[in-house]
Curated annotation (Swiss-Prot):
It holds the Pfam family Ribosomal_S2. Keywords: Chloroplast, Plastid, Ribonucleoprotein, Ribosomal protein. Signal peptide: none annotated. GO terms for biological process: translation. It is found in: Plastid, Chloroplast. Belongs to the universal ribosomal protein uS2 family. GO terms for cellular component: chloroplast; mitochondrial small ribosomal subunit. This is Small ribosomal subunit protein uS2c. One of its GO terms (molecular function) is structural constituent of ribosome. The keyword Ribonucleoprotein applies. The lineage of its organism: Eukaryota, Viridiplantae, Streptophyta, Embryophyta, Tracheophyta. Coiled coil: none annotated. It comes from Panax ginseng.
């Protein structure tokens, strides 16, 4: 795997609040190796460990992107949703930021059918065919289109299972993580002090509640993916 410099520094992570964990009563003992202290009733994440795993994740996504691999970014809680969409669009990744529909990956044939329906409806809307239908039929199909746009809009160009899935919140996206584990899809996951570090392929200990923390982690991963994609374009 290619080793590169990703400009990951502890001061920047401290400013973003990456080190702030959950209250000491809400923790997973498996996170003990990633916790450096307790402060005012909350656990403090060891940022040296965070930097190590973030570096490893950046190397992985760069290497994958440089070989033309496909990524899916998942983060559906309100405070992360816009960041997830922004990061995915910038790095030309697929994303889910509203609600994870159970079986989205493990029942891919059903998802594929929904995507075909979504594409057909979008085409009918663009060509004006929907407006030529009886009002009741048009209204029903427009509601369907709106529903599909909300939940599948971020994966509308996905033609198969992703090669790597990036998950912003382990607890919130547990169903998505389990589907990836079932299918053997490599995962990168932000893990707060109440998470299980053993579930993802690369777990990055970090505050998964603060927007500034989520933004910093996604920024680093997106930059690495974009660099990898540039390398792929130059040397296909």
């Amino acid at each position: 795997m290619t080793k590169r410099y990703w400009n990951i520094n502890l001061e920047e992570m401290m400013k973003a609040g990456v080190h702030f964990g959950h209250g000491t009563k809400k923790w997973n003992p498996k996170m003990a190796p990633y916790i450096s202290a307790k402060r005012k009733g909350i656990h403090i994440t060891n940022l040296t460990r965070t930097a190590r795993f973030l570096l490893e994740a950046c190397d992985l996504v760069f290497d994958a992107a440089s070989r033309g691999k496909q990524f899916l970014i998942v983060g559906t809680k309100n405070k992360a949703a816009n960041l997830v969409a922004w990061a995915a669009i910038k790095a030309r990744c697929h994303y889910v930021n509203k609600k994870w529909l159970g079986g989205m990956l493990t029942n891919w044939s059903t998802t594929e059918t929904r995507l075909h329906k979504f594409r057909d409806l979008r085409t009918e809307q663009k060509t004006g065919r929907l407006n030529r239908l009886p009002k009741r039929d048009a209204a029903m199909l427009k509601r369907q289109l709106s529903h599909l746009q909300t939940y599948l809009g971020g994966i509308k160009y996905m033609t198969g299972l992703p090669d790597i899935v990036i998950i912003v919140d382990q607890h919130e996206e547990y169903t998505a993580l389990r589907e990836c584990i079932t299918l053997g899809i490599p995962t990168i996951c932000l893990i707060d002090t109440n998470c299980d570090p053993d579930l993802a392929d690369i777990s990055i200990p970090a505050n998964d509640d603060a927007i500034s923390s989520i933004r910093l982690i996604l920024n680093k991963l997106v930059f690495a993916i974009c660099e990898g994609r540039s390398s792929y374009i130059r040397n296909p």
